[in-house]
Amino acid sequence: MEKQVIETVKAREIFDSRGNPTVEADVILSDGTLGRAEVPSGASTGEKEAVELRDGGDRLAGKGVLKAVNNVNTVINHALHGADPFNQAHIDQIMIDLDGTPNKARLGANAILGVSMATARAAANALQQPLYRYLGGTDLELPQTFHNVINGGEHADNGIDIQEFMITPVERTSFRDGFEKIVNTYHTLKKVIEDAGYTSGLGDEGGFAPDLKNSEEALQMLHDAIIKAGYTPGKEIAIAFDAAASYFYNRTTHNYDFEGKTYTPAALGDYYLQLLAKFPEIVSIEDPYGEEDWDNFASFTAAHGDQLQIVADDPVCTNPQLIRQAIQRGMANNILIKLNQIGTVTETLAAIRLARKNGYATMMSHRSGETGDTFVADFTVATNAAQLKAGAPARSERVEKYNQLLRIEEELGADGARLAHFPNNVMFD
């Protein structure tokens, strides 16, 4: 049988869960096999992320992606014609070299990533393998999931500055068992919010976005919902939050303007400790300090990283060079991984390997502007990333990721599927 090569690469402009344009890419092999991928987009974006190419101008508020689509249909299509789809690293390197910039500003990370993901899908389809199996082989595990059930910050129009309040299933006999506990808690939380006199409208990621007084009130509602759903906080369901502190970091004063008050970095750290004391079921904090405030980020890790998961997102942006620097500085103990922050499957794999090699955990992540594409679910299982955050158990673009994990568990066999837990499980000893 003749070996398949890439015949055609093409793209189109579609729309994401926020109604914004994004790129959908097709990779078609010489035997007609199709791989298709849809590219997500973030609202809370780190300054060091690869460039998402937008059209500018009046059309669609300047957010069109026809330039990126054209780059796929012309330059990338020409360069990849006849290439080997089973050599992912080579495909990605061709596009990186073709772009020629350090942040993919010429062709657009949204163009390059769409093709990178679609290539992996085409190769898996050609071999008649599930994507997670093609990318990961046989040593696979289902992730610990983190669900953003109260939205604040850039993800909601309310007065809360912390961006994501998450719940995660601790005790679970299967992925389905853990997810059902999350669903029960989510529906209970809706009633807790409404009983307190707030509306229960949804934010970008499917979590509720009530106009609460402050972040402590949000945590209290999570605590109450866990108990009312019939679970023990910290034992069966734990809490995590993403401060996304870059968005309330004052670059002039180097302080933090948070929910009507100004905090020095030390005072902000004390505030987090007060929350931990009141809600000991908090097990993970993401971006407690701004992406430029590496010293305080590292100091907080040194002081509390042995008892708390501390996740770095905006300071490192899935970039292996930045991850290496963060490791050298002792910043965080978990690296958030987002495919579109770096822009290719191969570079994302390199970021995960680098973190793991240095004893860091990893958490895969969706973006606030999502599509129905489930690539991130397969990728999480394939890489044994151990943790995944993909939003609340609501809104189809979020739930579809979890539904895909349910399918994967079924395919692996519920009894034999390995479940990931926190590395060095210090939080639950």
UniProtKB/Swiss-Prot annotation:
Any one Gene Ontology molecular-function term assigned to this protein's record: magnesium ion binding
The protein's Enzyme Commission number: 4.2.1.11
Residues bound to Mg(2+): 242, 286, 313
Recorded GO CC terms: cell surface; extracellular region; phosphopyruvate hydratase complex
Cofactor: Mg(2+)
Reactions catalysed according to its record: (2R)-2-phosphoglycerate = phosphoenolpyruvate + H2O
Database matches in NCBIfam families: eno
Protein name: Enolase 2
Species per Swiss-Prot/TrEMBL record: Lactiplantibacillus plantarum (strain ATCC BAA-793 / NCIMB 8826 / WCFS1) (Lactobacillus plantarum)
